[in-house]
Amino acid sequence: MLSYFKELSLNRTAWLLLAFVAFALEASAIYFQYGMGLVPCVMCVYERLAIFGLLIAGLVGAISPRFFLTRWLALLLWGFSAFKGLALAIKHHDYQANPSPWNQCEFKPEFPQTMPFDQWFPSIFAPGPVNCSEKQWEMFGLGMPEWLILAFSIFALMFVIVLLSQFKRAKPQYRSVFR
C-alpha cells in the first residue's frame, strides 16, 4: 500500500488533484460569501488561508514531483496547512459549541506585518462584522466548522500516509545492456 502512495506522490496528477480539491473549496467559500451573502468571520478567513496553503502545496508538488526537494517542500507545506487548518476548524467549532463572552475570536485578523493578506486581497481575506460563535449555515445538521474539520482531517490523514510512503524504498530498476 505504501509503495502505491509513493508512486502516486511521484506523479504530477496526484498533486494537481490536491490543488484542484483545494481550489474547489476556495471557490465554494467565495460562493458562500458573494453568492449566498454569508459574511466570513475571522476564523473563516484563517481557514481560507489554510486551504490556500493546500492549493499552493499542490501546485508546488506538481512542478516537479520526482525532484526530491520540490516534493518535500510541497509535503511540508501540505502538512503544515492541513494540521493548522484542522486546529483552526476545531477552535472555530469550539466557539460555536460553547459560546461565551470570554471565548470569542478577534475582530480583526492578526496577520504578520510583512504579509497583511486582508489588505492585499480584501475581497477574499477581509472578515466582516460577524461573531465566530454565530452559525450562519448548516447542511445535514453540520455547520461550516464541522465540515471543515472533516475536510482537514482527510487532508491530514492523506498527508500522513503520503509522508510515511516517502520512506518506502522504490523498486530497484534493473537495467541491462543486453535487454
Curated annotation (Swiss-Prot):
Membrane topology according to the record: Multi-pass membrane protein
Keywords from the named record: Cell inner membrane, Cell membrane, Chaperone, Disulfide bond, Electron transport, Membrane, Oxidoreductase, Redox-active center, Transmembrane, Transmembrane helix, Transport
Record-linked InterPro entries: DiS_bond_form_DsbB/BdbC, Disulphide_bond_form_DsbB, DsbB, DsbB-like_sf
GO molecular function per UniProt: electron transfer activity; protein-disulfide reductase activity
Cellular component, GO annotation: plasma membrane
Superkingdom as given in the UniProt entry: Bacteria
Disulfide bonds: C41-C44, C105-C132
TM annotation in the entry: 15-31, 50-65, 73-90, 147-165
Keyword Membrane attributed: yes
Keyword hit for Electron transport: yes
Similarity remark: Belongs to the DsbB family.
Stated role: Required for disulfide bond formation in some periplasmic proteins. Acts by oxidizing the DsbA protein.
Name of the protein in its database record: Disulfide bond formation protein B
Organism listed in the record: Actinobacillus pleuropneumoniae serotype 5b (strain L20)
Lineage, broadest ranks: Bacteria, Pseudomonadati, Pseudomonadota, Gammaproteobacteria, Pasteurellales
Gene assigned in the entry: dsbB
